[in-house]
Amino acid sequence: MLICALFVAVLGSAFAQQTTAFAGKPAILTAIGQSADFEMVKVLLTRNKIPFKAETLIKAEGLDSASQTLVLVVGASTKGLGAAGISIEAELARTKALLKRAKELKMSVITVHVGGAARRGAMSESLIEPCMASSDYAIVVASGNEDGFFTKLAAKANIGLTSVERISAVGAPLAAAFK
């Protein structure tokens, strides 16, 4: 009985909606892994009238105090990385440098994974792990978390995680995170 209660408490907190708006505006949106999922999240931010600047390859030195939140669209695409002329190793280094700079600037960080199972695997997970560890909040399409990977990372990082059924449902919790 105690184990069941503990499981429900841990799982419930991992899937808890972000109840308090915490993220400042404007935001910077970037693609971690260079997948086309970036474009979908861009549309959702626009629809929800969240002011943001979109830069797929922004580097740490491109972050400044003018933006208050870093939104990371995670999911590796070999085609996207190739088109951007960047290796997975260079993308991981860029990601870690971005996260370090965001912390220095006291920016809020939101990780978004909308690619489902197709944007999982070793390459994507190497990018997802540091993003989740440095995030304040995460939103995931449920099909990308069927194995509980994001749930475990969110619990380890002690951050809220919202799971939605469809990409179109990401907009509401994403907008609600902004004050």
Regions found by a protein language model. Name each.
Residues 2-13:
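Bacterial N-terminal signal peptides
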Residues 17-21, 28, 140-179:
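Charged, low-complexity C-terminal accessory regions
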Residues 20-48:
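Short, charged N-terminal beta->alpha structural module
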Residues 45-66:
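A short, well-structured beta->alpha microelement
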Residues 52, 109-110, 161:
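Hydrophobic beta-strand scaffold residues
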Residues 82-105, 153-161:
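A short, gly/pro- and small-residue-rich
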Residues 91-124, 166-179:
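Ser/Thr/Gly-rich flexible loops in soluble cytosolic domains mediating phosphotransfer, phosphorylation
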Residues 120-152:
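Structural recognition of alpha->loop->beta junctions
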